[in-house]
Structures are given as structure tokens and as C-alpha cells.
């Protein structure tokens, strides 16, 4: 690996090389994506090759076609491994990027963070998290995009079609520097197999949420929300987390936050994971305390932790179904239960069935996808049956928005309520995140210190904490608990050692909090106390995502299957000052089940940045509160009325509540 600043700049500016780089081998030490489904016909495979070769000069086609054929045959996709860059992949300080526009340089920083091997799940396949959450489809797209970003000025906009850089178009300084779409399909063509087919053809990709939108900040990105969920789960069952047991699964890019969240909440977390590389990554990063591979040893360890009321997180190397079944036999009481396997992607490595090893599963999904699907559905039925035995004993189980209940129901598992319509278990958004956070406007605000300096992150933590404490002094009773939890979070952020990759922080905040924190950052930048700051959020937020099985699962007026909110949100962000915007298909629950979007905004200390953040952040939160209010969510009605008092130009249509006796 060559990594001088000169090499880095030259390869960025070069884009797709004028001469072919040396062919790169398949690195067995890296966590790779499983082989994808062989779904293309012979003619479609020719089309996939034509599509891949169009990035290169015709003189290279004869050599590359054999290589790309081999990749398509071996992996089900054409990743163009040869074109992986020779420099180290990580979020460099913003001043090291050879860019004319600081906004573009910030986006380059964020892209490289998403592909950092310490951060990304399958870095060589350009997958950040979730098994198939892609930044790009291939390395040619990466190289071309970085070249465009280096060349562009602040009067241009880069247009990204599902990882493909369509080009730089004239715009203006107030327009976004980049507009991203991922997986935008004609509605009738959005099934799992449609993703397999059109992704293999090289014409679309699944961007998950923050993968394809360049806003991932490692597992920290979900740990605050997971901590809120675990804490409030224990509050819901009126039990202290001390000595309580939380059983779940997954140690990937998002699910890997669970053990850390359990530690912060103060409980015993048992998190099952079948992939030893994922376990090793999270253990080495300090995101899980202990690793156990024997069920008997796990049982003894949990009983000991219960007796001592320890705070500890334990990774079990194996299938979570085995854990649920063993704990039932051993009569270990589980207080909270959930699941964070990637069931948005059930047939291509998102969920590994009990009874098969990781290697056996990967071989079967490649050789006989129908048989693998049967094994997954059989496992889901067994999984749900084991969970049901625990809930009969008092376990509080919730769906973590990963399509567990959805796919279990499709498999015929016993997860339906007596009415045959609803699930017997709630989504965490229905019970916790929706009414407590989203309806009041609280969601996963985040920022990245573009200098890469940990001292800048410390300073921004202190600034954010001071702002929240000032807000809390006059805040209404309805949001005091949220502010209290968030102040405690930011105060303990440094000691919890959350950073993996870029110097970033996540903090749940409402519109008032986000705007005041951003303004305080911008002032600190103007005064040269800190470097540039990149603002953003998860798509999993108040306004960003329409998802009937997760983000909008607590919308009960029938509109949870509509996507007006997410579409309006990205359009509104685009002309209110975002540096880049994105809109995706399927984030979280899966392709065809969701429309989700996000933004990034660069703060440079200017008055212009102050105006942009005020306008855009206010809209970015209150759009969703208005929609939730119209759905008759009382917490949202309260929040939008408050917002209208603060901003006289905001006039929102409020619902009239119907007397149930009239119906």
C-alpha cells in the first residue's frame, strides 16, 4: 500500500487511470460480501459486461472483459477490484483533499470514511453496512466521483445516479454541490429479485441510509438511539437495567452498537453473531467486552453476571436462535429482547439460518437460492417460537425495524396478533422512539469535525452540552426527560470512546437544539476556535423516512404507506441550503419497503452558513412534526404548536379530533 500525500492527490486527480493498474488479488484477510444470487440470463450477463466496460477506453476492453466475466461468475457482481486505489482509505483532514470547493472536499472526506476498512463492513465491495448498503457499485465509479469532486467549483452540482456520477452540471452557489439518488425504481419493479437483477446489471444500487448518502459515522451512528431504546425499554417494564438481561443479535455496522448501548444503559447484553470477523472487529474496537463460543459457558457467565448485577456485554459466536432456546431450557430470565440481523436482505447474507455454519450458508445461497430461502424461513419460524416462550414468561420483545416481524410473518411464524392484521410485538418506534422522540422533534443529529482533530470534537461536545443545558432551563415539562438523557449522553461521550473512523458525534436533539448547537459551532469556527464542521443526521429521523414498519409505524391515520414526507423533505432541504442531499429506496427495512433521505451541510464560520443552517434545519425537523401532527399524534400537535409560536411565518394545518362515540 503506497500512501504518500503526493500519490493520494495524483490518484484522486487522475480519476480512471490512463493505463491499467496492476491486477489486485482477493484479500482473504478482509471481510468480504457473500457471493450474490446468480440471477442474470446469458444475454443479461453480456449487458452487464457492456455496462461495466463503458467506463474504460476501448483499448482496455479485451483485457478487462475476461476479468469482469470472472468477477461476475465468482461474486455475482462486477466490483472492478483492479481499480481499488493504492492509498490508505480513511477520513483525512479536509485540507488534504485536492479540491477547489470546501464543500466538495467535505464530501470526499465523508465518502472515504464510509469505505475505511475500520468502518465499512465489506470495504472491497464498497459496502458500508447492512450486508448490501453500498457507497458505489464499483471502483470506477469511486475514482470518477472523486475526480469530479476535486475539479468542481461552487457553481456546479454533481449528479449521482445510484453510485454512478452522471456528471457536473452548472447550478449556483445556493444549490447543493451533490444530489444523490439510490435505488429509485418504478414502483412495480422494487422486489428483492429486482434489486439482485438491476444491481448485477450495474444500473442501480441499494444505498441503505447513510452508506450511499456519505453520512455514516461508524456504529456510533446508532448507539445513542439504541441506548435511548434500551433505557426506555427497562423504564417501560418498570425495572432497573442493573442486573437485567438484554438478548439480541448482530455485530455489523449498525447492529454492532448494541453491546456498547447496553453497557451505557447499565445492563447485561448478550449479542449473538455468526461471523467471527465481525466479532473480532467489534471486540478489538472495545464495542463488546467478552467473546464466548460455547452455550454452556455463555449460560454460566450470564447467571454469574445476574447474581453480581454486572454491567457487561457478551458476544456469542453462533446463532441467536440457539441462545433463545438454551436460555429457555436453563430458565434464564430475559428482560428485553430484540434482533438486528439484516432481514431487509434475507436471502443474500442478511440472516443466517440456525443449523448451518456461516460457510455452509454462503455456499447454499450461491448454489441453490431457493433451498437457502427455505432454510431462512424455517429458522425464522423456530426463532419466533423461541422468543414466544420467553415473552410468555414476561420478556419485553420489540422489533428493531430490521424487518424481523415482517419476514417472520411471511415465513408463517407465530408473530401475528389475534386480529390477524397487526404483529403481536411492537416496533421500537411504536412504543418508544416515535412518541418519546420523533413526535417531539428529537432525532439523531450528528456532526463531523473536518479537521480530524480529536480536540475539535472535545470542544464541540462541550459547546453542545452548554447549549442543551441552557435550553433545559426553560423547556416545557413534556421534553425535560429527553433533554436530561441527551445532556447525560453528551457529558459521557468522551469516556464512552465512541469514535470509529472520523471525529464524529451523534446527539439526539430537536429543531431548537440542532439550530442553536449549529449556530454555536459556526461562531466557534468564525472565531478560529475549531475547524470546519459537517452537519448531518441519520435518515432514521423525524422527517427523513417513510417506513410503515419502522420510522412511521406510529402513524395510525392510514398514511404510513405513503412517501410524501420523505420526498418533500429532500426537496425542501435542497433549496434551503444543504451542501448535499440524498433520497433512497429501502433504507432499514428493505428494498421496496421504504423511502428515505438525508443531507449534509458544511459550516465554515460565515454569515451565509448561519442563514443556511437556520432555514434548512428548521424545515428538516418541522416537516415531519407537521405530518405526525396531522396524523393526530398528540405529542406532535404539542410540538408543532410550539414551533408556530417560535416562528410566526410557520402556519400548519392542525387536525380536529373526532369524538369516538360518534363513529
Can you name each region flagged by the protein language model?
Residues 276, 318-321, 340-345, 401-407, ...:
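Glycine-rich beta-alpha junction loops
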Residues 313-341, 345-348:
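Active-site/ligand-binding-proximal alpha/beta "capping" segment
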